[in-house]
Each structure stands twice: as structure tokens, then as C-alpha cells.
Amino acid sequence: MDLKVMTFNVHSGINSEDVPQRDYDGIAEVIKKLNPDIVGLQEVGRHGFANFPAWETDFEPAEYLAKKLGYHFYFAPAVVFQNKYPYGNALLTKYPIKSAKTVLIPDPKNKIDDGYFQTRSILVAELDNGITVLVTHFGVVKEEKQNAVQCVIELIKEIKTPVLLLGDLNMMPNDEILRPLFDVIKDVANGKNEPATWPVDEDKFVGEYEATIKNITEQKQARRKIDYIFHSKELEVKSEYVIQTKASDHKPYVVEFKI
């Protein structure tokens, strides 16, 4: 049986057009076009962001996308901005969800040591096809990344089913902090710095996210592989690719498996 899996940081629904708009319908169109069986989403929310005000409605992006596209879903908030705007990771799946939970990654002791900080989470869901999916978004602070890697490893070691790990890890493959993760689960790209997944628009985002880039790597090149799909040995990789789209500041990363 074939299985198409996708991870996509949706940038709070804000696209990369010349005049950016908050457009979850654009995200929906990308997902519809690619038609994955399982989708991990990061930066899902409707809070105020950059020049975009919060949506003062009952609109919940994960639920909206799931209903629009016909998927089962689970939303795992990492934080709740202003006590009313949940923000975090989401799972869309064609398979019913048997169980799901949100695991908060322990905060670093020093929350401002070398960059922007916010609490992060890991979504853990067991599907009725026998696969457990983890969806996450690591931070940019060193200790935060270390905590995240350790937390993911502990979760994976407890899981008895085949596993997928989908996420924006805010690290390139050569980052030493990632090494322990490679020892317990297989990276689809085998540690290669490709395909590049961020940013979509190099000229636009290098300036805007210079601080983030410095935390990802000391290197000065712009396009980076920071989005990942990891898998357990039961899943065989058939193909991997990204597509060009301005629906977000990240490119969707797609992997087709044989199971």
C-alpha cells in the first residue's frame, strides 16, 4: 500500500505574495492539489502576527481546513496568546484517529539566552491504519532544541507501532543537536541538506528573519532544509519532493511511502 505524507509550516495562514494576505484557503488549495493521506501542520493559529491583527471570530484554522478538505483532524496548541488565541501544531488525516494527545516540550531554564522563545508542543496521534504520527515545531533557543530532541526521543521509544515524525525543527541536518534523533528514527533525506524548504522567497525573508537564520546556522546561505519527515523501518521511501508555492513562507515537503 502507498502512503503520501506531507509536512507544512503554514505561517499562521500568511502567504508570501508581494502584498501578503492571511489566506487559509490558499493553504487548503495546496493540500487539495497534493492530496496527501497524512498532513502535519505547524504555526497554526489566528492570533495577531506581524502587521496582521488577530481574527476576532470563532474561526479555528485546523477545523476549517479539515472540514473543507474532508480530513479527520487533531489540533495540539503549544501556547494560547492573550488567553484566547490557541497556536500550535495540527494533524490532518484521511485515516480515523484512534487516540491523540498534546505533549508540551519543557521550557529552557533561560528563555532568552540566544533568541526568541515560546513554549512548543508535540502532537502524538495513533491512527487506525496502525501508524503513530508525531507533529512538532522546535524553537530557536539552543536549550529549547535540546529539550525538544530529548522529548521526541523518549516518546518514540515508548511507541510500539510504526512511527512518522513530521515537523519544522529549525535546524539544518548538520546541527549536532539533531544527531541523537538520527540514532532512533530514519530521516527521509538521510541527513542531506536538501530539499530546501525555507524560505520560499529568499530576498524577502532573509532580511525579515535574520535573527532566526543566525540561530539555525552560522552559515550565510539563504535557502535551508529545516522541515523534516522521519520514519521507522517499516516504511519504505518511494519519493520525496517540495513544491513551489507562495501560500506560506515554507515549502510543503512531501514523501511517498510504501507500507
Identify the residue ranges that each predicted region occupies.
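Active-site beta-strand/loop signature of hydrolases that rely on acidic residues for catalysis
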Residues: 4-10, 27-53, 92, 132-136, ...
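Short, solvent-exposed loop/turn segments at secondary-structure junctions
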Residues: 10-13, 45-46, 80-81, 95-97, ...
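Beta-strand-turn-beta hairpins that frame and shape the catalytic cleft
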Residues: 1-6, 85-89, 93-98, 117-135, ...
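Soluble or luminal CAZymes and related metallo-dependent hydrolases
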Residues: 19-26, 57-61, 115-119, 144-151, ...
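Active site of divalent-metal-dependent phosphoester/diester hydrolases
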Residues: 20, 55-57, 71-93, 110, ...
